């Protein structure tokens, strides 16, 4: 059994909430998080539990449906949610009459990640939801980037800058740094974090380079 961390639970809860501050989400503040993805995924679980640590209400959908997401958003005056691009596509596919039926003005953060989001899809979501659509790039192993809607308008397609204590390198096939605009493999470093793939030390070693790891992107 993994030992409990040697830290007071109240202190740990406050630290957990700091992650949401990367997206401008603040403690208390009548926050309401709508969970529309499976809680077994690290990101989904983190956004939900960290919201609880910040004193927010969390609304959990038993099964995600695009119109039901809109209905619950209006009913509970949801302030932030976390979705993936496929769900954006399904929301945008709703008839205009359905989309205009619900008040989404309570939202301050609609956060998305987990997969590439086409620029056209992102623009349409920003036109519909307003300047609340935040994007991040990350991995369950730790570390990543974030970009607010204001910066995305200037650099469409970007996933932003590294989080605090997170570093990013783009390396070529020879494990050398790529020049700007060159295609390479993403390597991430998050503080002093270390891990090993279960039962596969060889794969783990291939994923690491000078303290940075890659998931193959």
Where are these regions (language model features)?
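Conserved AMP-binding/adenylation subdomain of ANL enzymes
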Residues: 2-35, 40-80, 94
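Short, well-ordered beta-strand segments
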Residues: 32-34, 111, 186-187
């Amino acid at each position: 059994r993994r030992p409990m961390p040697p830290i007071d639970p109240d202190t740990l809860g406050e630290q957990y909430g700091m992650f949401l501050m990367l997206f401008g989400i603040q403690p208390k503040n009548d926050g309401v998080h709508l969970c529309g993805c499976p809680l077994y995924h690290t990101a989904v679980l983190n956004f939900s539990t960290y919201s609880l640590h910040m004193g927010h209400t969390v609304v959990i959908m038993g099964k995600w449906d695009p119109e039901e997401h809109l209905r619950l958003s209006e009913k509970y005056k949801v302030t932030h949610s976390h979705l993936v691009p496929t769900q954006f596509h399904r929301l945008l596919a709703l008839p205009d009459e359905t989309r205009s039926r619900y008040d989404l003005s309570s939202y301050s953060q609609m956060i998305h990640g987990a997969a590439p989001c086409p620029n056209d899809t992102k623009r349409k979501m920003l036109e519909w939801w307003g300047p609340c659509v935040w994007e991040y790039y990350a991995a369950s192993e730790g570390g990543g980037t974030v970009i607010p809607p204001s910066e995305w308008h200037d650099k469409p397609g970007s996933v932003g800058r590294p989080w605090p204590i997170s570093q990013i390198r783009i390396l070529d096939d020879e494990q050398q740094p790529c020049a700007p605009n060159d295609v390479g493999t993403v390597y991430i470093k998050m503080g002093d974090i270390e891990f090993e793939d279960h039962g596969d030390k060889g794969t783990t070693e291939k994923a690491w380079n000078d303290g940075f790891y890659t998931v193959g992107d």
